[in-house]
Amino acid sequence: MVNFNQFLKQAQSMQKKMQEAQEQMANARYTGKAGGGLVEVIATGKGEVEKITIDESLLKPEEKEMLEDLIKVAFNDAKQKCDEDSQNSLSGALNGMSLPPGFKMPF
């Protein structure tokens, strides 16, 4: 039989750890690169683009399509790093939490 008070303390501890992990993610910055660094995108932990840097060699009308592709790739690279870090942070917040049999988290 699971002690309800112990479970409640664990849940409160997990909630605090998850809140801390979310705050860390909100303050984190991720840099995605494409074209060997010709395009860089810096995104926040919330997935918002903060800055885009484009090498001047790509600022030619005939390079427009390639530039668009590189921006997309750089953004996706930054987002992937953000997603991986988010997953690791939340996994760490849940570490050590034992749930009663049959209890499932809402995610």
Swiss-Prot record:
GO terms for cellular component: bacterial nucleoid; cytosol. It is found in: Cytoplasm, Nucleoid. Transmembrane segments: none annotated. GO terms for molecular function: DNA binding. Keywords: Cytoplasm, DNA-binding. Binds to DNA and alters its conformation. May be involved in regulation of gene expression, nucleoid organization and DNA protection. Homodimer. This is Nucleoid-associated protein RF_1365. It comes from Rickettsia felis (strain ATCC VR-1525 / URRWXCal2). The lineage of its organism: Bacteria, Pseudomonadati, Pseudomonadota, Alphaproteobacteria, Rickettsiales.
